[in-house]
Amino acid sequence: MELDQDQKVETPEAAENGKDEMQLEEQTQDEDTTETETETETETEAEAEGADGTILERTESVKAKLVPQAEKQIQDEKTGIKEADRAIQEQTQDDETEAEGADGAILKRSESVKVKLIPQAEKQIQDEKTGIKEADRAIQELPANAELAGVKIQAWWRGTLVRRTLLLAILSAWTIQSWWKETKSRLQGRKLHDVMRCRLRNLNLKSISRRKRPNQSSFL
């Protein structure tokens, strides 16, 4: 009976000790779980930092590759535009030189035509004057009844000579004017063709640069 009482007395203390041990075990498990979670979070943060570093390194490497390429493309485009401008200026100077040469040739030809036509016209006028004098002399030598016919012949001859002179002058002026219009239109057509070709080249360069820039920004 005394042993049973001792056991009954010790049983609450054992129960309390058991509870304390269970609480200690739970605390230990909680601490282990907390440490495990902390280690997991630390590893996750380290992995995230490593991934961020890798992304930054890759971004820097991509920038290091693309930036020189973009600068080179821009420099090439600027060089192409400068060359196109230089070609336009050279072509314009050549066209101006050709136009000046054509103007000089036209002036020389006009002078040569004048030099040729003026003596011819003077000779024709002199011949007309000589013909008129001869006709007057012939009329004076004709009898009185033939004077009217002589006057008609003289008037017809004078009209023929005047019409021929005017026709020659008109034909010469028309020839010079037609040649000048043809030369001018040919020079203007050549200049317009060169200007359009240079403009198309500049537009192609600009379109190429606009196509390349979005690709570069997408890489960055």
UniProtKB/Swiss-Prot annotation:
| Any matching Pfam family | IQ
Cystine residue pairs:
none
Write the lineage as a comma-separated list. Eukaryota, Metazoa, Chordata, Craniata, Vertebrata
Q: Cite the entry's keywords alphabetically.
A: Coiled coil
Residue stretches of biased makeup (Acidic residues): 23-50
Which gene name belongs to this protein?
Iqcf3
Residues forming coiled coils: 69-93
- Protein name in the entry: IQ domain-containing protein F3
Chain ranges of the IQ domain? 146-175
Q: Where is the composition biased (Basic and acidic residues)?
A: 1-22
